[in-house]
Amino acid sequence: MSTNQGSLWGGRFAAGPSEALVALSKSTHFDWVLAPYDITASRAHTKMLFRAGLLNEEQRDGLLAGLDNLAEDVADGSFLPLVTDEDVHAALERGLIDRVGPDLGGRLRAGRSRNDQVATLFRMWLRDAVRRVAAGALEVVDALANQAAEHSSTIMPGKTHLQSAQPILLAHHLLAHAHPLLRDVGRIVDFDKRAAVSPYGSGALAGSSLGLDPDAMAQDLGFPAAADNSVDATAARDFAAEAAFVFAMIAVDLSRLAEDIILWSSTEFGYARLHDSWSTGSSIMPQKKNPDIAELARGKSGRLIGNLAGLLATLKAQPLAYNRDLQEDKEPVFDSVAQLELLLPAMAGLVASLTFNVERMAALAPAGYTLATDIAEWLVRQGVPFRSAHEAAGTAVRVAEGRGVGLEELTDDELAAISANLTPQVREVLTVEGSVSSRAARGGTAPSQAAKQLTVVRANANQLRQLLMR
């Protein structure tokens, strides 16, 4: 008889575990989310035991009926882990034995270890979870694309080093936030190639001697393939680290978008206004409208980076094969998914609800002498070496700055004094509209290019949705 109630081991021990060990080992408070996957795997395992001749038809059918009943009770919340259950596996075995008896219920464990079991369940859960995250990321992409379509001709100051640089289209800038998220979703699609390998049948580490068929088990569980090496299958968690990286990267990309929104909605920038439903107020300052969603996006990005770093640190020095350290592999990943499932719809709603101050952005677009590059490139088109053109444009900025005027306000005489090549025809490029329209090379900010970029973003988003449905 086991000396360890609620666990799957104990016969070798003359005494049960200490209370401190039980408390330390317990994982049902976080691994219960794997319960539906555990039952699904147990159904497939029951059928595999039958095919291997280890169960007769009556035993197979009895186990499957018990598992079906247990699944219903788990789904409606009438079956939950007890304080004595060590983990999700122990809790579900207890529930099954309660329904079919110890003799029949005790047969299910043949040929499997918690090592291959949990590695498989984690992969099953994660393959579903990444699809939910990807769908949320694509909702943010849609919101960015819709705003870009709405503002196809809106001009704004483009910045580098947070200093005014060149005029660009707002659509161009918004789509620049969409592309990283599309790459993140592409990583999720690619990730599945490595996650979709079943460890089931690997046992504790050495494989099974009971005539089980890992390939058939993999197929039953929706995996394209079974693992090639049972030691690697039970010990590897690079799939979890890869997912944690993608989650952290999504959070970082959202954080960069959030930072723009925080700046744009400030009084000093005044580019955008927050919708009442997607912002908060102050407990003491009545006038405040705070970008809490964006600020929480910044904060949560740090949390997800920490989850990735913590998981990698857990993995870094473990010898093969399985070690109990791997109990710590799931919480960081579970948390990252949970945070993104909160954050992504909030960010999509925030972006979709932004109202842009088109007039202010247009007025600020030439500020900071953002047309200086256009002067230099106009001179290059006249045959002037770029080094000389750059010098002349810089001098024009210094002269205009000294007079407190814009580049377009310099007189013909002042321009000629700077460089004989600066004829009155240079005024063709001294408008923000002309500057933006001239950037018509692939990927540029010209309206024609921004329209193509919008088409590409929407097409890529639709293609990724189709891939995620496979």
From Swiss-Prot:
It is an enzyme of class 4 (lyase). Pathway: Amino-acid biosynthesis; L-arginine biosynthesis; L-arginine from L-ornithine and carbamoyl phosphate: step 3/3. The keyword Cytoplasm applies. GO terms for cellular component: cytosol. Its main location: cytoplasm. InterPro entries: Arg_succ_lyase_C (IPR029419), Argininosuccinate_lyase (IPR009049), Fumarase/histidase_N (IPR024083), Fumarate_lyase_CS (IPR020557), Fumarate_lyase_fam (IPR000362), Fumarate_lyase_N (IPR022761), L-Aspartase-like (IPR008948). One of its GO terms (molecular function) is argininosuccinate lyase activity. Keywords: Amino-acid biosynthesis, Arginine biosynthesis, Cytoplasm, Lyase. It catalyses: 2-(N(omega)-L-arginino)succinate = fumarate + L-arginine. PROSITE patterns: FUMARATE_LYASES. It comes from the Bacteria. Its EC number is 4.3.2.1. It holds the Pfam family Lyase_1. GO terms for biological process: arginine biosynthetic process via ornithine; L-arginine biosynthetic process. It is found in: Cytoplasm. PANTHER family: ARGININOSUCCINATE LYASE (PTHR43814:SF1). Belongs to the lyase 1 family. Argininosuccinate lyase subfamily. NCBIfam families: argH. This is Argininosuccinate lyase. It comes from Mycobacterium leprae (strain TN).
